[in-house]
């Protein structure tokens, strides 16, 4: 079979290895290739312009590639990673799948839930960790998948047993073109889910037509306190605060519902679940606090790549003066809602990256103190010169990092290095 993999990344490379083992003819197409060549694994790689849909029997698209891309438009047999994997399931092996999506919190919640479900041999994958084809080859029985809006957009058949949607705020508008498309992508899976499946959804979307028309069973939530009350857990029983408390509460809710489906009693598992969850360590670059050599508090929230994540970070330090490093690739999002919230804070901005002058213009409009630093190191230097012991220095950029860094991780690591440098 002639297979075209659109995009040359972790997901498609894993698929390429699987197809190669099964004696298929595999070609990769990617904008980053300027001419044809063989990569280090011996795969044939071509520039996107060389793709011929008449010379291909199956195309699987890397989720980061937009539906407006010429490769996607030309493809005649386009299938998502999720739908292809779904086509492999049979009577011999079909895993139980829990999907977690949302603008923010999905990585943390996926990691928390996977840990809670360890006794059921749960493994995480999708957007984090392992590509789905590798989970399939390992025959892992329970998949907890962090699922992006990109993957959901392209998927037309596959659905999970439980779908958790944590939140939806403006993000990835360059890819989706507008917020309505982004919202519809996040909700699309509900059109595929049958009566035997369960969707756990934000209350504010209860009246949305897609949700109203979905056959799936539904649970709606609003605040973490309400979720914990439903589970008969006092809010002080968990050691998390702010957005992380909601992540933890939702992980427990999904766990409770999974146990219910398995005809197991929540009360038999509750105390152990709380103990394990309270031992969970939040990942790097997510509200990660550290102190400089003078004992002043700095916070690495480099993973805050959108407005909502930054707003959640600010709430944690509501009563302190905040020196906020903001900027990067804002992905077509209007930052005005963020600036409207700044009036509730004592805040000084340090603008970096490709959106620095957009931030400066908004700061002037909203009368917020702002220095255009462009470079992260310059922003750190400026803050170092004025930061007092009772103030907070916060990197929570509300933007992706790829205009200046290889990833949000590199941005966070460099931030810490600049702070700790003499």
From Swiss-Prot:
Its EC number is 6.3.2.9. It comes from the Bacteria. Pathway: Cell wall biogenesis; peptidoglycan biosynthesis. InterPro entries: Folylpolyglutamate_synth_CS, Mur-like_cat_sf, Mur_ligase_C_dom_sf, Mur_ligase_cen, MurD. The keyword Ribosomal protein does not apply. It is an enzyme of class 6 (ligase). ATP binds at residues 102-108. Cell wall formation. Catalyzes the addition of glutamate to the nucleotide precursor UDP-N-acetylmuramoyl-L-alanine (UMA). It catalyses: UDP-N-acetyl-alpha-D-muramoyl-L-alanine + D-glutamate + ATP = UDP-N-acetyl-alpha-D-muramoyl-L-alanyl-D-glutamate + ADP + phosphate + H(+). GO terms for biological process: cell division; cell wall organization; peptidoglycan biosynthetic process; regulation of cell shape. Belongs to the MurCDEF family. It is found in: Cytoplasm. GO terms for cellular component: cytoplasm. The keyword ATP-binding applies. Pfam families: Mur_ligase_M. Keywords: ATP-binding, Cell cycle, Cell division, Cell shape, Cell wall biogenesis/degradation, Cytoplasm, Ligase, Nucleotide-binding, Peptidoglycan synthesis. Gene3D superfamilies: Mur ligase, C-terminal domain, Mur-like, catalytic domain. One of its GO terms (molecular function) is UDP-N-acetylmuramoylalanine-D-glutamate ligase activity. Its main location: cytoplasm. This is UDP-N-acetylmuramoylalanine--D-glutamate ligase.
